[in-house]
């Protein structure tokens, strides 16, 4: 989108080792960018870790190869790559296909495309990163894709593992990798986390840290890099109990959803409430939908505009075989829709594979309210005889017999064969088959009473790519402040008779420079790198006036800068606007005697008078967003009303189909959430438009926040 500019000079990330020509995909943050990132992570922790009571961890970035072999990363963590047959240059195959299709859909000659062909290309693009090597080769060949740099032919796509390999220790005999995600550290520490949480689920663990991926073709600034910060959450929950106690608080939030069925049909977004998405089976369960909604609220709170945010469901061939449902939060940027946050229901896969490989029970046990009698198969036999007969294979035989008993039916089938013929064939690990006899083993059906349930929890995982979200924030909060006087002067100069070409070119250059000088980042105050600038307007102002203001701001935790430059106050304001500093305090020669300063707000440029003693605390409250500028403006003497606020500077608000439930006082005096009722009609399955349906209701009996029930005629 043209309204999203590239980074300005203040926030451009620096290429790593820039004085040595840089390295693709590696970046350093400067002072302003680093401050925004730290503030972003602080808001993230407050929004998720604090509010949800999560257990935060910090795990090592060096990971033994055995861990990532078990998780599947060694074998499957790869992108498909093609090479230029002439130069050997490497390209990511799916992105090359996407770029080619984008050019066909929007470039020269695109208007001649038939509707059916346009639809086909859009569907191919939607599936590009889910194709097998053979399917991708077929599409690249069909579209006659060649190397974008040399025009030469490309090799067939082949997998390229994205992990950085290393060795741990001086002997070099322990292979390892730089972690490609932070999640595995939390999975292998699950047992300790469960103990810390007193053995109870649901609970969530989280981690903020660096991950590494050896990207084939890094590009687009922070969007595709080789080292990046992730903030990941692993929410552990009973596999059959994926309701969420706080779901009603977000059920009325309306989101832009892009379900898989729409991606393969009309390509339309669906506007619907989170509650209706669960009721209609669009999102698999309440817990997954809850985190999707919480992510939407978080992204909007840090400056992402709701109209530039959508949630796209993974196609069936994109998801891992163990995943139940996956939704990506995508932010609209200059390069298109960019995946920034993944939400996946990973089932119990990770804990299951690590449990099996480590021979450690990564399970949860909890007492049953009423003991249950369950059918069991009891095995008897002569283990000594089996040991002598099977020798080295006996361990595998015993494991296969135990598995048959656990399953029940296979063991009774073995007994039936023993009763009928005196022998039974047993398949063991490795594909071999052994013969059992009646004097070796027997099986008997029975029952036993169990008093506790043992289960492997499912995992709901929201995973945040911090750098990508920051780039989205930079693009969504940037605007050029209109300057009516400069525009009028430029128009008058252009209209002046006799203006020469040289004069016009000079004027155009000046206008471009003016645009840069009036660049503004409309960061929310909590995200701004510096909260307030203290402008000293007169060289006669003694330090004894300025220093106490700065000292009190520092004591209150408010970051500030002092600007006593000799440039005009307008230029000094512009410099701070470009840094996204939301507030400015002006101190003049009369401040000492009057006890007053003026406070300027960045986006409206309005100013009010404040008492010197009150200013630091008011600025602190504004920076923490516990009060608003509108309140301050209404309660204090106005110096000037400023200018109309630019549309891109107006803080966007999420849309609610119905407001979240308000707390109601119970008989015991504690707050209990009210029971909400969602009355918005669910959307049609594919068209994305609302159609009359039976209203969705909320039941709250016996639950903290209630849960949604399916209507009589749920969405197919």
Predicted regions and their residues:
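NTP/phosphate- and nucleic-acid-binding module
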Residues: 1-716
